[in-house]
């Protein structure tokens, strides 16, 4: 085995098998595990996926939402143990791989048309 095959086999052990099919433009609810003191809880973070990056164990999504008039973006590693679950709330119809133009838009201009041809 060469080095690349060894790395892929080690990464394959840590991949999450039950991730939903997600695309840029989808509205998702990401459950993030948070440890406070001795307790662990799951905090939901809901927003629109504006970018997806890489593949394999390094696959990331950038989720954007507007909270109290301020745009907040978080980058999540999909295969991280900190991610408890990912739930697709709504499918979006977009024609771009990256939706960075939404950063400059405010209010109703940030809406994305809903897509019905893909199941939730």
From Swiss-Prot:
Q: Which GO terms describe its biological process?
A: translation
A Pfam family that this protein carries is: Ribosomal_L19
UniProt xrefs under InterPro entries: Ribosomal_bL19 (IPR001857), Ribosomal_bL19_CS (IPR018257), Ribosomal_bL19_sf (IPR038657), Translation_prot_SH3-like_sf (IPR008991)
Disulfide links within the chain:
none
Output the Gene Ontology terms for molecular function.
structural constituent of ribosome
Q: Which domain of life is it from?
A: Bacteria
Q: Which GO terms describe its cellular component?
A: cytosolic large ribosomal subunit
Question: Which terms are listed as keywords in the entry?
Answer: Ribonucleoprotein, Ribosomal protein
Q: What does this protein do?
A: This protein is located at the 30S-50S ribosomal subunit interface and may play a role in the structure and function of the aminoacyl-tRNA binding site.
Which family is it part of? Answer: Belongs to the bacterial ribosomal protein bL19 family.
Recorded protein name is Large ribosomal subunit protein bL19
Species:
Gloeothece citriformis (strain PCC 7424) (Cyanothece sp. (strain PCC 7424))
The root-end lineage is: Bacteria, Bacillati, Cyanobacteriota, Cyanophyceae, Oscillatoriophycideae
Q: Which gene encodes it?
A: rplS
